[in-house]
Amino acid sequence: MEVISTNTNGSTIFKSGAIPMNGHHNGTSKHQNGHKNGTSEQQNGTISLDNGNELLGNSNCIKPGWFSEFSALWPGEAFSLKVEKLLFQGKSDYQDVMLFESATYGKVLTLDGAIQHTENGGFPYTEMIVHLPLGSIPNPKKVLIIGGGIGFTLFEMLRYPTIEKIDIVEIDDVVVDVSRKFFPYLAANFNDPRVTLVLGDGAAFVKAAQAEYYDAIIVDSSDPIGPAKDLFERPFFEAVAKALRPGGVVCTQAESIWLHMHIIKQIIANCRQVFKGSVNYAWTTVPTYPTGVIGYMLCSTEGPEIDFKNPVNPIDKETAQVKSKLAPLKFYNSDIHKAAFILPSFARSMIES
């Protein structure tokens, strides 16, 4: 078997002609999280299943030249993209970093085998994580971004002319290097005079931040495993609340309602203990994330009341209060802002309980 990328959580890219075989961390025998996918061995063009049945070797279920994402956070399922070209593969001090050109979504960034952003499919995530919080407060001036080292989040934030200072704290310098090489139009924004890029630990930075300094904090983190784990714990939220001005807001990614309600409920419980303004959960659709959706926690500190569900600072063209030379928004508008807080009955009952 010829493998050009095997990541620690089991995701793999196979070259043409490569066939997954038993015993490799490619998801065909056993994931690192200990879950089997029901296959045991391959012989003579067939894949034998644990129940004694067989899949034909020419089945469309397995194809060479595809990236497949496996994770302990979504056991029993995987997401695949056809790979046109591997652009970068490396291991930083914190995680495996890979960038490839996909057939459908442009460049795809993965960290430890999990898709973080796609060039042509990730804009719903970045537009919402920025405009849900900043559209909910008038005249944001000082903002902190935790993570976001590729630069998509910063790109969206620069739509607001009231912004005076943006601090970005990215733990992984390799992610920033990938941005500079493969996304120069994004990395150029790191040179904006309002922007300070810090290579370091986001949790430590927030803990040391000046009290009541920021109008908004955006936590553009990966999943709650590996280097991002601390960004979902109560001590981190306490530090965030301290760093926000009265009536300041925070937005952090908060997983999928289809798979992670147990994680979401814990995040909400932590936030309700810390943030004395309001605590809200919103969600949106992102085609390349597990289950096709992602959630956000939106919280405010005690002070001027923040109504996240009714934007006071919208930036869509119909109600534009913000003028920008950037390209038009592709996803966000005032209606989607309001709709993001409408939850399915099962999720609403669990979150409100």
From Swiss-Prot:
Pfam families according to UniProt: Spermine_synt_N, Spermine_synth
Active site (catalytic residues): 220 (proton acceptor)
InterPro entries (UniProt xref): PABS (IPR030374), PABS_CS (IPR030373), Putrescine_N-MeTfrase (IPR025803), SAM-dependent_MTases_sf (IPR029063), Spermi_synthase (IPR001045), Spermidine_synt_N (IPR035246), Spermidine_synt_N_sf (IPR037163)
Region (Disordered): 15-50
Transmembrane segments: none
Annotated catalysed reactions: putrescine + S-adenosyl-L-methionine = N-methylputrescine + S-adenosyl-L-homocysteine + H(+)
Name of this chain's protein: Putrescine N-methyltransferase 2
